[in-house]
Curated annotation (Swiss-Prot):
GO terms for molecular function: chorismate synthase activity; FMN binding. Reduced FMN (FMNH(2)). GO terms for biological process: amino acid biosynthetic process; aromatic amino acid family biosynthetic process; chorismate biosynthetic process. Belongs to the chorismate synthase family. It catalyses: 5-O-(1-carboxyvinyl)-3-phosphoshikimate = chorismate + phosphate. SUPFAM superfamilies: Chorismate synthase, AroC. PROSITE patterns: CHORISMATE_SYNTHASE_1 (PS00787), CHORISMATE_SYNTHASE_2 (PS00788), CHORISMATE_SYNTHASE_3 (PS00789). This is Chorismate synthase. Pathway: Metabolic intermediate biosynthesis; chorismate biosynthesis; chorismate from D-erythrose 4-phosphate and phosphoenolpyruvate: step 7/7. It comes from the Bacteria. FMN binds at residues 124-126, 240-241, 285, 300-304, 326. CDD domains: Chorismate_synthase.
Length: 360
C-alpha cells in the first residue's frame, strides 16, 4: 500500500475512519519556518464534518496535535508529526455491511487485493484520511506564503448548476462566506437548495472544484515524467471520489484551432515575458511559465445513498445494501480545502526540487 507522497517535501499519512486517530508525518520541511498552529486548525475546520446542513453530520472537532518537529513555534527541520484523535465513531452503523460490498465503494477491491478489510466507515479508504493531507497542506501553504505563491479553490459546479464566470472576474475569497464555498452568492444559493433537496430524496450528487495558483515563478516542474501538470493531476486523482482533472483550456481546447489556442508572448513594462492568453493554464512543456495555474477537479456523487441497492456478499450471493451512518450528500463543500492542500504540497515540493538543481 502506498501511503507516502512527495520527493523532498514528503508526507506519509496514517489511520482509519473508525480507528483511534488519523495523522501525517511531514519530512523535508525546511527549518526555521514559523508554524502557526491557529492557521493549521483553521484549515482543519474548513474540512471537518458537521459544519453545515449539506455535509455529513458526524461531529468531530478535528483538533490537531503536533507531536514533533516544532520547537518554540518554529520548524526544526526534522520530521513533523501531526495527529487528530477520532471521537465520534459509530461503528455499529456498518455492521450490516461486514460481508457485503457497497456499490461503487472500495469494499470489493480492498477485499480482493488484501484478503481482509476494515469495513467500519471504509477504514483506510475513507475520506477521513484527507484530514491528514489538509494538515500537511497547511504547512506547505506557510512555506509558499514566504515566496508569495497563493492557492485558492472554490466550488464551480454542483450537478447541473454551473458557475460560468471566469475566475479573474470573481472575488474568490467570498467563497468562504457561504456553506457551499461558491464565490457567487446567487449561484451558491441555488447550489445549496439543490444539495438539500438531493439529501431529502436520500440521494447524492457530484460537483466540480476549481483551483487557481498565483505567483508561481517560471521553472517549476521536472520533465519528462514529473511534469508539473502530471503531478498536480496525480495529486488530485488521489483524492477520494475524484473522477476527472483538467487544466488550462482542458477538453474545451480541442474545439479551437492552433491559431486560436496558442498563447502569444509579449514583454510587459518591466520586461517580464508574459502571454496574451492563458490556454496553457500556466504550464508549458510540464514547466510553469509564470502565468496563473488553473485547473478543475470533478467529484462523483457519494457512493453511499440512503436507498436500497442490489449487490452481492462475500459468498457471491445477491443481497440488498441499504445506506446507514452519516454521509455527505455532496463532497465538494469540504473538498475545497483538500484540493488546496494537495496543490500546496505539490507546489512546495517542486519549489524545493527546483532550488536543489540551481546554484544561482
Amino acid at each position: 500500500m502506498s501511503n507516502t507522497y512527495g520527493t523532498i517535501f514528503r508526507i506519509t499519512t496514517f489511520g482509519e475512519s473508525h480507528g483511534n486517530a488519523v495523522g501525517v508525518i511531514v519530512d523535508g520541511c525546511p527549518p526555521n519556518i514559523e508554524i502557526d498552529e491557529a492557521f493549521i486548525q483553521s484549515e482543519m475546520a474548513r474540512r471537518k464534518p458537521g459544519q453545515s446542513k449539506i455535509v455529513t453530520q458526524r461531529q468531530e472537532d478535528d483538533e490537531i496535535e503536533i507531536l514533533s518537529g516544532v520547537f518554540e513555534g518554529k520548524s526544526t527541520g526534522t520530521p513533523i508529526a501531526m495527529m487528530v484523535r477520532n471521537a465520534d465513531q459509530r461503528s455499529k452503523d456498518y455492521s450490516h455491511i461486514a460481508d457485503r460490498f457497497r456499490p461503487s465503494h472500495a469494499d470489493y477491491t480492498y477485499q480482493e487485493k488484501y484478503g481482509f478489510r476494515d469495513y467500519r466507515g471504509g477504514g483506510r479508504s475513507s475520506a477521513r484520511e484527507t484530514l491528514a493531507r489538509v494538515a500537511a497542506g497547511a504547512l506547505a501553504k506557510m512555506i509558499l506564503a514566504k515566496v508569495n505563491i497563493k492557492i485558492q479553490a472554490y466550488v464551480s459546479q454542483v450537478g447541473p448548476l454551473k458557475l460560468t464566470t471566469d475566475y479573474k472576474a470573481l472575488n474568490i475569497p467570498n467563497a468562504e462566506t457561504n456553506i457551499i464555498r461558491c464565490p457567487d452568492d446567487a449561484v451558491a444559493a441555488k447550489m445549496i437548495e439543490f444539495i438539500d433537496e438531493t439529501r431529502k430524496n436520500k440521494d447524492t450528487i457530484g460537483g466540480v472544484v476549481s483551483c487557481v495558483i498565483e505567483g508561481v515563478p517560471v521553472g517549476l516542474g521536472e520533465p519528462v515524467f514529473d511534469k508539473l501538470h502530471a503531478e498536480l493531476g496525480k495529486a488530485m486523482l488521489s483524492i477520494n471520489a475524484v473522477k476527472g482533472f483538467e487544466y488550462g483550456s482542458g477538453f474545451e481546447g480541442v474545439e479551437q484551432f492552433g491559431s486560436q489556442h496558442n498563447d502569444k508572448f509579449y514583454a510587459d513594462e518591466q520586461g517580464n515575458v508574459r502571454t496574451q492568453t492563458n490556454n496553457s493554464g500556466g504550464i508549458q512543456g510540464g514547466i510553469s511559465n509564470g502565468e496563473d495555474i488553473y485547473f478543475r477537479v470533478a467529484f462523483k456523487p457519494v457512493a453511499t445513498i440512503m436507498i436500497d441497492q442490489e449487490s452481492i456478499n462475500d459468498k457471491g450471493e445477491t443481497v440488498t445494501v441499504s445506506g446507514k451512518g452519516r454521509h455527505d450528500p455532496c463532497v465538494v463543500p469540504r473538498a475545497v480545502p483538500i484540493v488546496e492542500a494537495m496543490a500546496a504540497i505539490v507546489m512546495v515540493d517542486f519549489y524545493l526540487r527546483n532550488k536543489a538543481i540551481r546554484l544561482d
